[in-house]
C-alpha cells in the first residue's frame, strides 16, 4: 500500500466522472450524480447508486447533478462527490494524498477554473493541476501534440462540446459550446412531448438516442418503442419512434455544434490548414458516438473525420498520460495554480 502511486487523472464531466490511476489505467467511471436529504444535506448515495434514484426519489430526497455545461453548478456537492470518488480509488489515508490532473473545458473562465482546482484540493488532493479538455482528449486519442503540426479535435461530451486546433503542445484556436449530448436528450424529451403528448424521462430519451439516434437521415429507418405518461389521459402509454424523428428532434443542437466547427475551421492559420486536410478531424467524447456523426462532419467540412478508438475515455486517458510526463508543466501544457 505504501508503494502505491496515488497520482490521478480526472475527467470531471457533466454526465460522468472518469478516473485514471497511474500504473493502473481507468479505475472508475460513474455518473456525476449525488443523492442528499433535502433537510440536512446529508449525502445518501453517489454515482451509479444516486443516478438510479433520479426521478424516483420521495420528497425528502434530492438527486443532484452538480456539474452543468462542464462547470461547477453546486460547489459543495461537487466537492463531496469528488471526495467520495477519490476515497473510493485511493482509500481514506490522510497521509498519502493524491496528486491530481483534472480537466476543464477550453472556454472556462478563470473563476470556473479556480472553482475546479479548489474543489479538487478540498476533496483531498495533495496537488492539483488543470489541463484543458481538448488537449487531454488529443493526448488520450494518441496524437503527438508536441510537434509543429496541426491536430483538430472535436470533443462532444455531456455538457460541453470543445472544438480545437492544437500544435506545439498548445491550443491555436478553439471554440467551447455549452451544447452537447445532454442537449440531444432534452431535445428528444421536448419533441416527444410536443408531437405525441407523451412525457418521457431522461433515461428513456438517452436510450432512444443510443438505439436509433442519427446525425444523418438513414436509408433504412430504425424504430424503437418507448413508454411514458400520456399527458391527456395521465395513463402509461407506449409508442414507436423512428430514427428520422430523432434526427428532426436534435437538428438544432447538431446545427449549433456544426456552426462551432465551421467557426474554428475559418480561423485555422493557413500553414496548419494543410495538416488538418491531410490528417482529418478526430472525434472524442460520448456525444461523438451518435450514429453517422463522423460522416456528417466529413460532408459539411470536406475533411475526413474519424472517431477515436476509445472516445468516452480519451479525456481521462490524456490526463493520465500527462501524469506519466508531469515535467511538461514547464512547457505550459497544464496551468498549475496550487
Give the role of each language-model region.
Residues 1-156, 164-282, 288-338:
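Nucleotide/phosphate-binding catalytic cleft detector across ATP-hydrolyzing
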Amino acid at each position: 500500500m505504501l508503494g502505491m502511486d496515488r497520482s490521478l487523472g480526472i475527467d470531471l464531466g457533466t454526465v460522468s466522472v472518469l478516473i485514471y490511476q497511474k500504473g493502473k489505467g481507468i479505475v472508475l467511471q460513474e455518473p456525476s450524480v449525488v443523492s442528499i436529504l433535502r433537510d440536512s444535506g446529508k449525502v445518501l448515495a453517489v454515482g451509479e447508486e444516486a443516478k438510479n434514484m433520479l426521478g424516483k426519489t420521495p420528497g425528502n430526497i434530492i438527486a443532484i447533478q452538480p456539474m452543468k455545461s462542464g462547470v461547477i453548478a453546486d460547489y459543495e456537492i461537487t466537492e463531496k462527490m469528488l471526495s467520495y470518488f477519490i476515497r473510493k480509488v485511493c482509500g481514506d489515508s490522510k497521509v498519502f494524498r493524491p496528486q491530481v490532473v483534472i480537466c476543464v473545458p477550453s472556454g472556462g473562465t478563470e473563476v470556473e477554473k479556480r472553482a475546479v482546482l479548489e474543489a479538487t484540493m478540498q476533496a483531498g488532493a495533495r496537488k492539483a493541476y488543470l489541463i484543458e479538455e481538448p488537449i487531454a482528449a488529443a493526448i488520450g486519442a494518441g496524437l503527438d501534440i508536441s510537434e509543429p503540426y496541426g491536430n483538430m479535435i472535436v470533443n462532444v461530451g455531456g455538457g460541453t462540446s470543445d472544438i480545437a486546433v492544437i500544435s506545439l503542445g498548445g491550443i491555436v484556436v478553439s471554440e467551447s459550446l455549452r451544447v452537447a449530448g445532454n442537449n440531444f436528450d432534452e431535445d428528444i424529451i421536448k419533441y416527444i412531448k410536443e408531437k405525441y403528448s407523451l412525457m418521457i424521462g431522461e433515461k428513456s430519451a438517452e436510450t432512444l438516442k443510443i438505439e436509433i439516434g442519427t446525425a444523418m437521415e438513414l436509408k433504412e429507418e430504425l424504430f424503437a418503442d418507448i413508454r411514458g405518461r400520456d399527458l391527456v389521459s395521465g395513463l402509461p402509454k407506449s409508442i414507436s419512434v423512428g430514427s428520422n424523428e430523432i434526427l428532426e428532434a436534435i437538428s438544432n443542437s447538431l446545427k449549433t455544434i456544426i456552426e462551432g466547427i465551421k467557426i474554428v475551421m475559418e480561423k485555422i492559420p493557413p500553414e496548419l490548414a494543410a495538416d488538418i486536410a491531410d490528417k482529418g478531424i478526430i472525434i472524442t467524447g460520448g456525444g461523438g458516438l451518435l450514429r453517422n456523426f463522423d460522416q456528417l462532419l466529413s460532408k459539411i467540412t470536406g475533411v475526413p473525420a474519424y472517431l477515436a478508438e476509445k472516445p468516452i475515455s480519451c479525456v481521462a486517458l490524456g490526463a493520465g498520460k500527462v501524469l506519466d510526463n508531469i515535467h511538461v508543466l514547464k512547457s505550459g501544457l497544464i496551468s498549475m495554480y496550487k
